């Protein structure tokens, strides 16, 4: 009888693991979905549709909160729209996720230089 208990426990564990694996999307699927949102955001930003781009990049970081490039793009869009506090936070999150990413670091340093120098710049709601 003692051999039945461990087998049933193992079976329950396997069933639980399989259920979780099929219930949630894989990391690769999430990253691909986030990349699609980022690409769409880039496309609409190039056409001047910054609010739509922000929506897409916000979706990207909801889908994959570890996607530093999406935070960088989001920061640029917030900056463009005058949402400077949000831009700063997005740049900082991008740097937290990718501290060695020179593009993110360069964008953030330029953002700080411009906004710290023009401290009188008003933020849009």
Regions found by a protein language model. Give the residues of each.
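Register position in tetratricopeptide repeats
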Residues: 46-47, 80, 110-117
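Conserved structural position within tetratricopeptide repeats
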Residues: 59-62, 95-96
């Amino acid at each position: 009888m003692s051999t039945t208990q461990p087998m049933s426990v193992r079976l329950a564990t396997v069933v639980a693991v399989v259920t979780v694996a099929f219930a949630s999307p894989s990391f690769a699927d999430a990253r691909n979905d986030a990349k699609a949102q980022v690409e769409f955001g880039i496309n609409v930003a190039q056409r001047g549709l910054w609010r739509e781009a922000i929506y897409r990049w916000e979706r990207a970081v909801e889908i994959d909160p570890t996607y530093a490039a999406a935070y960088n793009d989001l920061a640029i869009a917030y900056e463009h729209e005058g949402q400077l506090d949000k831009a700063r936070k997005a740049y900082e999150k991008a740097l937290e996720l990718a501290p060695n990413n020179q593009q993110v670091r360069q964008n953030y340093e330029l953002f700080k230089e411009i906004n710290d120098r023009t401290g009188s710049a008003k933020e849009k709601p």
